Curated annotation (Swiss-Prot):
Principal subcellular localization: host cell
Organism encoding this protein: Ostreid herpesvirus 1 (isolate France) (OsHV-1)
Membrane topology per record: Multi-pass membrane protein
Transmembrane feature ranges: 1-21, 112-132, 151-171, 189-209, 261-281
Keywords associated with the record: Host membrane, Membrane, Transmembrane, Transmembrane helix
Lineage summary: Viruses, Duplodnaviria, Heunggongvirae, Peploviricota, Herviviricetes
A single GO cellular-component term on record: host cell membrane
Name of the protein in question: Putative transmembrane protein ORF111
Disulfide topology: none
Subcellular location: Host membrane
């Protein structure tokens, strides 16, 4: 995996998220099933019984109870008549101007935002630990066992967080599938971040982690070389450390080459979906629902 391509995907994902969470909500005037929230319509009835008698004298009792209609994602309806009429037209729900109560249907709210927050915290901790260790080594102090253990834990947590974020987004989509099959805007946002976390996890395990481990080994060799009194042996260790730090890990194979081109091609995804949602918001074309 090539670093710059992954970084471009990450930048595009952040930009697209800002667009979806800010401009997109402002752009949409229609609160039908294309908005970022999730609600369902629930008719508010009092429980009543109506008794009727047919021609044969049979008495029939009809009980009217509160009825929940199928999920109808909207932004914030809150009993607004215009909003509920749009929901009625899209989903075929007949509310007939009865009182409407809107309640959330999502089991997991904003999985993409949760993922961004968790990954950001873990990356921040990882960067702080690495910078602290590098500064410690540059100052002439050896890295302690605790520091190396802490770096190892953060390396493991970073990969686990990236891989777990993909699983979390998939589970959230499955859990709220009735909502996401109608609200493609939120679905697109979640799928996009799941894709980004996936390529970050692959890039991390195949490129970033080996490179970082190699750099740390090179720095440790330099520190050890300074403690060796034999000048020739110390020089050899410094040369080895320099080579270890700068030589490529391995020549890219066929899989890496194909993956690089596919990731480059996938960069077109971000402008394509942005143009699509702008067109939907401005009413230039109907959403795909």
């Amino acid at each position: 995996m090539i670093g710059p391509i992954v970084v471009l995907h990450l930048i595009c994902a952040v930009g697209f998220s800002i667009f979806m969470l800010q401009y997109y909500n402002i752009l949409y005037d229609k609160p039908a099933c294309n908005h970022m929230g999730g609600c369902e319509m629930q008719d508010i009835y009092k429980v009543t019984e109506n008794s009727t008698e047919d021609e044969n004298g049979t008495l029939t009792t009809t009980t009217i109870k509160p009825v929940k209609t199928p999920a109808c994602p909207v932004k914030e309806c809150r009993g607004d008549e215009f909003c509920c009429k749009l929901c009625s037209e899209v989903k075929g729900n007949d509310y007939s101007e009865r009182p409407i109560h809107m309640e959330s249907t999502l089991y997991i709210h904003n999985p993409a935002i949760i993922t961004i927050a968790i990954v950001g915290v873990v990356i921040g901790v990882f960067i702080i630990v690495c910078i602290a260790n590098i500064c410690r080594m540059k100052s002439g102090k050896r890295g302690t066992t605790f520091v190396r253990f802490l770096i190892g834990i953060t390396l493991f947590l970073l990969f686990l967080t990236l891989a777990g974020s993909v699983a979390f987004i998939v589970i959230s989509i499955i859990s709220d599938f009735d909502y996401y099959k109608d609200c493609h805007a939120k679905l697109t946002l979640n799928i996009s971040w799941g894709f980004v976390c996936g390529i970050l996890a692959i890039s991390y395990s195949t490129s970033i982690l080996p490179s970082f481990t190699r750099i740390m080994r090179a720095e440790q060799l330099k520190r050890d070389a300074l403690d060796i009194p034999d000048h020739d042996e110390s020089t050899q260790m410094l040369i080895k450390a320099d080579r270890l730090k700068h030589e490529p890990i391995e020549k890219p194979g066929l899989f890496s080459t194909i993956a690089r081109y596919l990731l480059t091609l996938c960069l077109l995804w971000w402008p394509a979906i942005t143009i699509y949602f702008i067109g939907v918001g401005q009413g230039r074309w109907l959403p795909i629902v």
